[in-house]
Amino acid sequence: MAEKKQWHETLHDQFGQYFAVDNVLYHEKTDHQDLIIFENAAFGRVMALDGVVQTTERDEFIYHEMMTHVPLLAHGHAKHVLIIGGGDGAMLREVTRHKNVESITMVEIDAGVVSFCRQYLPNHNAGSYDDPRFKLVIDDGVNFVNQTSQTFDVIISDCTDPIGPGESLFTSAFYEGCKRCLNPGGIFVAQNGVCFLQQEEAIDSHRKLSHYFSDVGFYQAAIPTYYGGIMTFAWATDNDALRHLSTEIIQARFLASGLKCRYYNPAIHTAAFALPQYLQDALASQPS
């Protein structure tokens, strides 16, 4: 039997992970990034950008449920949601499940990502691009949040790692723009890497966000594709009560929403804000 082709991730220099490639569905360099989608027997369809895995069919639900339902249920009455990035459509899919949300704006820098994900990752978007509340804007995320006249209750930054095009979504200019277009009491969340391997990323985000928001923290989830431990999500708001809501309050909102999830539940919601001591110590050691 012929040996299967392997695809190796290049995020770290000294170690990494690989996937057996059963079939390459798409591989092309766009104006902004090198994209590949291939099939793997264990993880289904896998999408990678610039040598780094972004999403797989097998475990994407963990990431997307935690990035959407945690801020939306903590907020309690979000009407207008902004997604930065998220071209695969799975973040949009989860937001559309909240029937009280009135508008969903998604800003994606690369129109090519949206078009090929609609074709090659249909399970990710599950038809959500056709939701009448949805509006797609092709623009740079930093430019959008600093120029738009719209305001939002929840902003979700579905950013790549802070390299290449994704680097700008970890800058003070981006965070300041998000604060600018966030309604009072609104919540900003962002992907912030696997903290055991990318601790400096979390520290840097915490320091920058603290200039614009009075309550900055992280919550976490374990996602197999993003190897190396727990993945952290940045959390920023000016309402510190939202991070400390009881499980009973979240439970009531969850039941009222009618959501059926595969990973998220109210107990996971409140527990996710408990962080490992090494991350707490690293954040506490930073100058104020």
Curated annotation (Swiss-Prot):
Gene Ontology terms, MF aspect: cadaverine aminopropyltransferase activity; protein homodimerization activity; spermidine synthase activity; spermine synthase activity; thermospermine synthase activity
Pathway per the UniProt entry: Amine and polyamine biosynthesis; spermidine biosynthesis; spermidine from putrescine: step 1/1
Effect of substituting C159A: Reduction of 23% of the aminopropyltransferase activity
Active-site positions on this chain: D158 (proton acceptor)
Thermal effects: Optimum temperature is 50 degrees Celsius.
Effect noted on mutating P162A: No influence on aminopropyltransferase activity
Activity regulation (record text): The activity is thought to be regulated mainly by the availability of decarboxylated S-adenosylmethionine. Inhibited by dicyclohexylamine, S-adenosyl-1,8-diamino-3-thiooctane (AdoDATO), sulfonium-deaminated analogs of S-adenosyl(5')-3-methylthiopropylamine, p-hydroxymercuribenzoate and N-ethylmaleimide.
Subcellular location: Cytoplasm
Any single GO BP term: spermidine biosynthetic process
CDD domains registered for this protein in UniProt: AdoMet_MTases
Keyword Hydrolase tagged: no
Recorded consequence of changing T160A: Reduction of aminopropyltransferase activity
Residues annotated as signal peptide: none
Keywords, in A-Z order: Cytoplasm, Polyamine biosynthesis, Spermidine biosynthesis, Transferase
GO cellular component: cytosol
List of residues binding spermidine: H64, D88, D158, C159, T160, D161
Predominant location: cytoplasm
Sequence positions that bind S-methyl-5'-thioadenosine: Q33, E108, D140, G141, P165
Catalytically driven reaction(s): S-adenosyl 3-(methylsulfanyl)propylamine + putrescine = S-methyl-5'-thioadenosine + spermidine + H(+); S-adenosyl 3-(methylsulfanyl)propylamine + spermidine = spermine + S-methyl-5'-thioadenosine + H(+); cadaverine + S-adenosyl 3-(methylsulfanyl)propylamine = aminopropylcadaverine + S-methyl-5'-thioadenosine + H(+); S-adenosyl 3-(methylsulfanyl)propylamine + spermidine = thermospermine + S-methyl-5'-thioadenosine + H(+)
EC top class named in words: transferase
Result, substituting D161A: Completely inactive
Effect after changing C159S: No influence on aminopropyltransferase activity
Subunit architecture: Homodimer.
Classification via HAMAP family: Spermidine_synth
Stated role: Involved in the biosynthesis of polyamines which play a significant role in the structural and functional organization in the chromoid of E.coli by compacting DNA and neutralizing negative charges. Catalyzes the irreversible transfer (ping-pong mechanism) of a propylamine group from the amino donor S-adenosylmethioninamine (decarboxy-AdoMet) to putrescine (1,4-diaminobutane) to yield spermidine. Cadaverine (1,5-diaminopentane) and spermidine can also be used as the propylamine acceptor.
Protein's name according to its UniProt entry: Polyamine aminopropyltransferase
